[in-house]
């Protein structure tokens, strides 16, 4: 009986250690997508080909610096397949776009803590 209890305890520890890393960052990732959708809604008033409902499951998400930097790759325009990347920083619990970061260079130069690749992109 003790062996069974020990096995279950060890299994619980292993499963807890293997939990999905993305859950750790999900609140901040949600903030980033919400901010991006708000910006897209404003931009779509000027250019109606911009998508206004960006979803994480249709995009690529890369988390860096333990959740402080999040780069998302989205299909910005309705009729284009091209992915556009936007870098965000999480400051004081808010997602803010950082226009000083080159997202492609940043992704090449840094190792991601978490990646969620939902759209296949040709790596150059």
Model-derived features: positions:
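Extracytoplasmic electrostatic interaction patches
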Residues: 47-124
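C-terminal motif of bacterial Sec signal peptides marking the signal peptidase cleavage site
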Residues: 13-17
């Amino acid at each position: 009986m003790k062996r069974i209890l020990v096995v279950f305890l060890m299994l619980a520890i292993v499963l807890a250690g293997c939990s999905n890393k993305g859950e750790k960052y999900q609140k901040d990732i949600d903030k980033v997508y919400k901010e991006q959708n708000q910006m897209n809604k404003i931009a779509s008033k000027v250019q109606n080909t911009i998508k206004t409902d960006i979803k994480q499951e249709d995009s690529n998400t890369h988390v860096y610096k333990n959740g402080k930097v999040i780069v998302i790759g989205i299909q910005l325009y309705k009729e284009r397949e091209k992915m556009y990347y936007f870098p965000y920083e999480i400051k004081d619990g808010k997602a803010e776009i950082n226009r000083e970061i080159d997202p492609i260079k940043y992704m090449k130069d840094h190792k991601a803590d978490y990646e969620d690749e939902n759209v296949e992109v040709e790596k150059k």
